[in-house]
Regions:
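Active-/binding-site microenvironments in catalytic and ligand-binding cores
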Residues: 1-195
Length: 195
């Protein structure tokens, strides 16, 4: 955020409370009185990386659900890789097949669709992450791959994900824990493997 006098503020947290979006900043100078207008700027490289990782996770999770009935029981977008935990074990061959199927969705460059169905429409829909949610539910649909309730940021189409690469898999709590990378991270991982 930039103040009218040019002073820059670093946003350290964003949350919603009572329908108002609050930005917490690292320090607030005396020149920033309540009601002062600020200019916001998004760190696009950081945001786009997170969009690639998150959309790639949706694609792979949806494919694993279709192929093996696997539920995504946890994921974390880390600074190096995305961790995904599945509800069922999946063989190495099954993971190779799922990785290829997920990348085929990327290469098809299908649109990532965002909808806000009514409660009646939602009751008739089949989608992942079907939990009791208060208020409006946002559905992310990636044709051929996934339909899921989600409030995260995504690419506009699957082609922007670039590539999905499974780096590692280990048995974890009756399922499998995957480490994946997408987009530029996948390219950098492939380059590192050649060295």
């Amino acid at each position: 955020l930039t103040l009218p006098d040019g002073a820059r503020l670093t946003v350290t947290d964003v949350h919603e409370q009572g329908g108002v979006i609050w930005h917490r900043v690292d320090a607030l100078p005396d020149t920033a009185a309540p009601g002062t207008a600020v200019t916001g700027r998004i760190d696009w490289a950081w945001r786009f990386d997170k969009m690639q990782q998150h959309t790639g996770e949706h694609i792979l999770s949806g494919i694993l659900h279709q192929m093996f009935g696997a539920e995504n029981v946890g994921f974390h977008i880390g600074s190096d890789a995305v961790r995904m935990d599945t509800s069922v074990p999946i063989s190495a061959e099954g993971l190779r097949e799922a990785e290829l199927a997920a990348n085929r969705i990327v290469w098809q460059n299908v649109p990532v669709l965002i909808t806000y169905p009514t409660r009646e429409e939602l009751a008739r829909m089949t989608y992942r992450s079907k939990k009791e949610i208060e208020g409006q539910v946002r559905i992310v649909t990636i044709p051929g791959a996934d339909v899921c309730a989600c409030c995260g940021t995504h690419t506009a189409a699957t082609g922007a994900v670039g590539q999905i690469k499974i780096l590692a898999a280990e048995n974890y709590k009756g399922g499998v824990r995957l480490s994946i990378v997408c987009g530029e991270r996948a390219l950098l991982a492939a380059q590192a493997m050649r060295q």
